Every structure is written in structure tokens, then in C-alpha cells.
Regions:
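Condensing-enzyme catalytic core mediating Claisen C-C bond formation in acyl metabolism
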Residues: 91, 175-240, 244, 251-253, ...
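N-terminal extracellular/periplasmic Venus flytrap/periplasmic-binding protein-like
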Residues: 125-216, 279, 284-286
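Active-site pocket-lining segment
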Residues: 111-113, 149, 156, 226-295
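Conserved catalytic cysteine-centered active-site region
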Residues: 5-58, 102-108, 172-198, 279-306, ...
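Flexible glycine-/small-residue-enriched beta->alpha junction loops
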Residues: 59-115
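Conserved active-site "lid/cap" helical segment
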Residues: 1-11, 15-23, 30, 114-123, ...
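Conserved beta-ketoacyl condensing-enzyme motif
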Residues: 1-60, 64-83, 150-164, 257-279
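Active-site-proximal alpha-helical scaffold in enzymes
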Residues: 36-66, 116-145, 205-212, 277, ...
Length: 343
């Protein structure tokens, strides 16, 4: 079991191990928790793929999980003692997830602002993209397109048993308010709470095995991983890093852009998807067709796996075959993965 988790403070030892045993897997199951920021869930899938190729595993559960709403506050000097003067509470979500490690205190959204200004992607276009993402997510919910990728969870209370089977974030948003929101990261800026991803909780996982193992177990694989790639650059350039990852991936597996039926590019910010769309010349009708993180949220360690799950189901829903998913990563990196549905 390989599971991404970026905000593990307060979760107890080895969150992936806890998840595996809590799900009823055998105590002999090997487990690893990964932290590659926003790319954790995809990196878990990549490592699972490579373990299978190397013959080091027979079956891998790969994915990610994040409960951003439970990220604790920290008292940095509590162990050694606060001697004199004021102390401060440190938000572990900001410190470990939303702030740049190389310019302490600088939020990821300020780099999205820089990217938007550099590429000339204005507020109106970002807002229009966010509204489109929301509309697509709501349409996918209404049509049942998400049903194949969501495992319902039952929560038992003293009064009733609640069945959770629908993302709540799209229902909370008001598309009419999107153009009226104030900039979130910079006075006079263009990035807002609506055209950026929301803070949310979630988990996603994929079951990986070789085709021979699936046949032996009587299982029919949904898709085959055709390749993966990564890109790294300056930490502040993370919003455009998926462009390099996708280009490297397509060259590596000898696919052309036209060979790809659907793309999923994580909407950490609307400008990330728009930058890739412009640089690669992507058809907007083939990009994030069921909406993205602007509408659904971005649980940090989860999203890399979530977009793979969504991509597979979107391809199935439309009767298509090939897809590419990519995600930007705090620190200046990105990963991309190509898959193809099986006959």
C-alpha cells in the first residue's frame, strides 16, 4: 500500500499503515506513506507501477488521502520553552502545505499571480474558467458520471445513518458571485478563492497489478499505464511545470497531442490549467471535462490520484480510450501519467 499524505501532523504513526489495517487488509501488507506535496497521490501510483515492473510487488494499492480540516496548529517552542515575550501559533496547513519553503511565508497563490501576470491571463478569463469547471462538475454529478469513481461512506449518528456519496463543494458555490470576489493573495490581483482550488478533505486510490496477475485472479483491468514523466524547475515556476512534464511524457511514449482523447490537469489554480492549455494548444473540450479542483477541491495528498480516477471514468463515460493526467507540485515540480483503457 502506497498512500500520499502531506499533512500528517497529529494523525499518528504511519498513516498509510493505519488506512490499510483499518480497511481490513492483512497485517502482512507492506505500507508506505509518501509526501511529494500535491503530486503525492500520483507519485504513489508511479512508484506502484515501477514496483510491479521490477517484480518487487504483485498487487499495489496506490493513492492519497488528506484531511485538511484537521491540520493542527503548532507551538514551535513549546518543547524547549517560551522564555520571554509573545509566542505564535503556527498553522501546519500553511507551513507544510500552502507556503513556499524557499521564501518562508509566501503563499502558493502569489506564484499563481506571477504566472497570470507573466502570461497575460487576466481575472475575467480565470473566472470564466472557474465557472466552467463548476458547471462541468455539477453536470457530471447530475448525470451520474461520478458514480463510478465514488465509494459511498456511511456515517452513523445517534439519530440516523448518513450516506455520503456526493462531493459537497460544487453545491456550496454560487457561480454568480465568482466575478465579485476580492483577490485572495495580492491587492489588485486576479487570483481569488473561486478561481483557485478550495481547502477540502478527501481520499482516492487505484488497484494496480500486472495483466497476468489480473487474469489469474479473474479480474478485468480498466486501464493500462503507458508511461509517466516528471519535470522540475525553479520553485516559483510550479504553475507551468505540468507543461514540461506532459511534453516529456508524450515524447517518451511516442504519442502526439492528437493521440490523447482527454487531459486532466489539476486545477490548483485556474491559471495552471489555462497556461497548459495555451502552451500545448489543447482543445478546451478535452480538458478537465468533469470539472476540476476549482469546483471539487484539492486535498493536497489526494489530488494526484483523484485526477487519475476521474480520467479513467471520464474516458469510460464517453467511450474514449487514451488519457493523460498531470499535476503541479509545490517546489517547482510536476508529474504526468498516460493511460489507455483496455478493450
Amino acid at each position: 500500500v502506497l498512500l500520499g499524505c502531506v499533512l500528517p501532523a497529529g494523525l499518528g504513526q504511519a498513516p498509510a499503515r493505519q488506512a490499510a489495517l483499518g480497511a481490513g487488509l492483512a497485517q502482512t501488507t507492506r505500507c508506505t506513506t509518501l509526501n511529494k506535496m500535491c503530486g503525492s497521490g500520483m507519485q504513489a501510483t508511479i512508484l506502484g507501477h515501477d514496483l510491479l515492473r521490477a517484480g518487487s510487488a504483485e498487487v499495489v494499492v496506490a493513492g492519497g488521502m488528506e484531511s485538511m480540516s484537521r491540520a493542527p496548529y503548532l507551538l514551535e517552542k513549546a518543547r524547549s520553552g517560551y522564555r520571554l515575550g509573545h509566542g505564535a501559533l503556527i498553522d501546519s496547513m500553511f507551513l507544510d502545505g500552502l507556503e513556499d519553503a524557499y521564501e518562508p511565508g509566501r503563499l502558493m497563490g502569489t506564484f499563481a499571480e506571477d504566472c497570470a501576470a507573466r502570461l497575460g491571463i487576466g481575472r475575467e478569463r480565470q473566472d470564466a474558467y472557474a465557472q466552467q469547471s463548476l458547471a462541468r462538475a455539477r453536470q457530471a454529478q447530475a448525470s451520474g458520471a461520478f458514480a463510478g469513481e465514488i465509494v459511498p461512506v456511511e456515517v452513523v449518528t445517534r439519530k440516523e445513518t448518513l450516506r455520503l456519496d456526493t462531493d459537497e463543494q460544487p453545491r456550496r458555490a454560487d457561480p454568480a458571485r465568482i466575478p465579485t470576489l476580492k483577490p485572495a493573495f495580492r491587492e489588485g490581483g486576479t487570483v481569488t478563492a473561486a478561481n483557485a482550488s478550495s481547502i477540502s478533505d478527501g481520499a482516492a486510490a487505484l488497484l494496480l497489478m500486472r495483466a497476468s496477475t489480473a487474469a489469474h485472479e479473474g479480474l478485468t483491468p480498466l486501464a493500462t499505464i503507458r508511461g509517466h514523466a516528471a519535470h522540475a524547475g525553479a520553485p516559483g515556476d510550479f504553475p507551468t511545470a505540468p507543461i514540461g512534464a506532459i511534453r516529456t511524457l508524450l515524447e517518451r511514449i511516442d504519442w502526439q497531442l492528437g493521440d490523447v482523447d482527454l487531459f486532466e490537469i489539476n486545477e490548483a489554480f485556474a491559471v495552471v490549467a489555462l497556461a497548459a492549455q495555451d502552451a500545448l494548444g489543447l482543445d478546451p473540450e478535452r480538458l478537465n471535462v468533469h470539472g476540476g479542483a476549482c469546483a471539487l477541491g484539492h486535498p493536497i495528498g489526494t489530488s494526484g490520484a483523484r485526477i487519475l480516477v476521474t480520467l479513467i471514468q471520464a474516458l469510460r463515460h464517453r467511450g474514449l480510450r487514451r488519457g493523460v493526467a498531470a499535476i503541479c507540485i509545490g517546489g517547482g515540480e510536476a508529474t504526468a501519467l498516460a493511460l489507455e483503457l483496455n478493450d
